[in-house]
UniProtKB/Swiss-Prot annotation:
A motif (DDXXD motif) lies at residues 356-360. The gene is TPS22. Its EC number is 4.2.3.-. It comes from Arabidopsis thaliana (Mouse-ear cress). The lineage of its organism: Eukaryota, Viridiplantae, Streptophyta, Embryophyta, Tracheophyta. This is Terpenoid synthase 22. Binds 3 Mg(2+) or Mn(2+) ions per subunit. Involved in terpene biosynthesis in roots. Possesses sesquiterpene (C15) synthase activity in vitro. Does not seem to be involved in diterpene (C20) biosynthesis. Pfam families: Terpene_synth, Terpene_synth_C.
Length: 603
């Protein structure tokens, strides 16, 4: 990768708030003139419209037949650049956190605490989002406690404590049996009715039941039992308002499927209204605000980079979604020390969105084919032979990856960059084939579609470039596991692909885009859309269980890598819980971005 003109340097890291320029050859928009005149996002440079040229095709008929882009404009502009991130505030937060950490560590390691009490404290740290400061201590405690599992559960009849221990052990990769919940069943093999009065126990059992592996029937039963009764409990006057809100938040989305930083913010509000430990509460608030400052500084770096390469102006059909992309990357890495990882993953994600939109929503089949052929060659010298808009797309991908390789090579992690390039090519080939189907109006069988759809989902690629900067994980071991095509990554891809297809089905069909998992299932099985969605949702649930089974059994790669795979699932739920929130971010996603980047917690 010799052709990149500028790479990361130390001064571009987020704590200095300076952006990395990834220059392209022209500042002119190369989008067709008649579409430019109707595009709402171009008001900042209207004086340049007379310089625009047609993007790809030489045939005006092709240009006039292109559909106008349907995505909403960027919601945020440059607002993030005005958010204060003073060094003094940053230093104050860091100093306070460092002063409290030993106190929390002493609570955790105290010889006066039983194993159960330590595990319950670990659970509280997970809920408050502060667990990452004590990973070594937590792993040591759980390793020792797991050796005494029988003693831990002997005579334990408290539902909340049992469910907490089950959840914590599973989250840290210990394969605890779901049989620990048998004691809460009656002679009729159903959960005992008196459990319903234990609101906290019911809520904790509900959360724990989401960590099921295949064939764990008791956890399926627990989920149905708790969901049914919690819906009723949330509406009862006898239930305290803050507990009702906590129940409703969990029923809307369990903690396991929420971004960790979002779950932490919610739980901090809940914990504050409970009988709480002031030290732990303050520590959680300081951590949230400290993470928030980190994220905003990283976003300032990324915003300057995004403005420099100026792709939304040059290619106005693309979805301009920098903050929305970044919040998805945050789902993968909560911890402040993964700043470089968040920057790298956001940059790669942004240029892949550009490629996706070009193939999916703008290019003709011949243009898509040319784009992917050039991508396969990965030859900077051949870029100038491409039509103008394709040249910009390829250049943005190639130069971004070259920048990243330049940054990672001195760190000894360049092979992950090369593997990411290969994954981008695989994704590109899938885009081309799906584009061929779509332009021909061909609806493949669901079985044919799903294999190609997994590649086009980009989730394997996303996982690969999420690992690039994880210097605490051995690169060769991680890459070898990745190349073995593990069941965990396949299950993750299925979850993303099918969740995306359900969320986008109605809009895609309105646009005449018939190559969608739901539509393919309807065709192959000759069923209604409603039945197809129901069956596909069952496939999604089954693949969650496969992921958990793999998480508990894989020994060939370190736990942090497996955790990132689960965190990508949180991204899926963030983007596609109610429609396509990435394409249309007004609503819940907009509110989440506002709360995470613009509203610190009062101390």
């Amino acid at each position: 990768m010799e052709a990149a003109r500028m790479g990361f340097r130390a001064k571009t890291l987020p704590h200095l708030g300076n952006g990395t320029r990834l220059p392209l050859k022209t500042k002119l928009s190369l989008f067709p003139m008649h579409l430019l005149q109707n595009h709402t996002t171009l008001s900042r440079r209207s004086t340049k419209l007379n310089l625009c040229v047609k993007a790809c095709s030489k045939t005006s008929g092709v240009e006039s037949s292109r559909p106008l882009p349907h995505s909403a404009p960027d919601l945020w502009g440059d607002h993030i650049l005005s958010v204060p991130t003073e060094n003094s505030e940053f230093d104050t937060l860091e100093t306070e956190i460092e002063s409290i950490k030993p106190k929390v560590r002493n609570m955790l390691m105290s010889s006066h605490k039983t194993d159960k009490e330590r595990i319950c404290l670990i659970h509280l740290l997970i809920c408050l989002g502060t667990f990452h400061y004590f990973e070594k201590e937590i792993e040591e405690i759980l390793e020792q406690a797991f050796r005494k599992l029988d003693m831990l559960f002997t005579d334990e009849d408290d539902l909340e404590t049992t469910a907490i221990m089950f959840e914590v052990f599973r989250l840290y990769g210990h394969k605890i049996s779901c049989d620990v919940f048998d004691r809460f069943k009656g002679v009729d093999a159903k959960f005992k009715e008196h459990l319903v009065s234990d609101v906290r126990g019911m809520l904790q059992l509900y959360e724990a039941a989401h960590l099921a592996t295949p064939f764990e029937t008791i956890l399926d039963e627990a989920l149905s039992f708790t969901r049914y009764h919690l819906e009723s409990l949330a509406g009862q006057q006898a239930t305290a308002p803050h507990i009702s809100r906590h129940i409703l938040n969990a029923l809307y989305k369990p903690r396991f499927l929420k971004m960790e930083i979002i779950a932490a913010r919610e739980y901090i509000h809940f914990y504050q209204k409970e009988g709480h430990d002031e030290t732990l509460l303050k520590f959680a608030k300081l951590n949230f605000n400290f993470c928030q400052l980190h994220y905003v500084r990283e976003l300032k770096t990324l915003t300057k980079w995004w403005k420099d390469i100026d792709l939304p102006y040059k290619l106005p059909y693309i979805r301009d979604r920098l903050l929305e992309t970044f919040i998805g990357v945050m789902a993968v890495y909560l911890e402040p020390h993964y700043s470089l990882g968040r920057i790298i993953a956001t940059k790669v994600s942004q240029v892949i969105v550009v490629m996706d939109d070009t193939c999916d929503a703008y290019g003709t089949f011949s243009e898509v084919r040319s784009l992917i052929d050039s991508l396969e060659r990965w030859d900077p010298g051949a870029i100038d032979k491409l039509p103008s808009c394709l040249r910009i797309v390829i250049q943005s991908i190639v130069e971004t990856m070259e920048d990243i390789e330049r940054e990672m090579k001195p760190r000894g992690r360049s092979s992950s960059v090369q593997d990411t390039v290969e994954e981008i090519k695989i994704m590109g080939r899938a885009y081309a084939e799906i584009s061929k189907w779509a332009r021909a109006g061909h609806v493949p069988t669901f079985d044919d579609y799903i294999e190609l759809g997994l590649d086009s989902s980009g989730i394997r690629c996303f996982a690969m470039y999420s690992f690039i900067s994880m210097e605490d994980c051995e690169e060769n071991q991680t890459n070898a596991w990745f190349k073995s095509k593990p069941k965990m990554l396949r299950a993750l891809s299925v979850i993303f692909r099918l969740t995306n297809d359900i969320a986008g089905f109605e809009e895609e069909m309105r646009r005449g885009e018939v190559v969608n998992g739901v539509n393919c299932y309807v065709k192959q099985h000759n069923v209604t859309k409603e039945l197809a969605v129901r069956e596909i949702k069952k496939m999604i649930r089954d693949n969650y269980k496969i992921m958990m089974e793999e998480f508990l059994t894989i020994k060939s790669v370190s736990r942090p890598i497996l955790v990132r795979c689960f965190n990508i699932v949180r991204l899926v739920n963030l983007y596609y819980e109610e429609g396509d929130n990435f394409t249309n971010p007004n609503g819940k996603l907009k509110d989440l971005i506002t709360s995470l980047f613009f509203h610190p917690l009062p101390l």
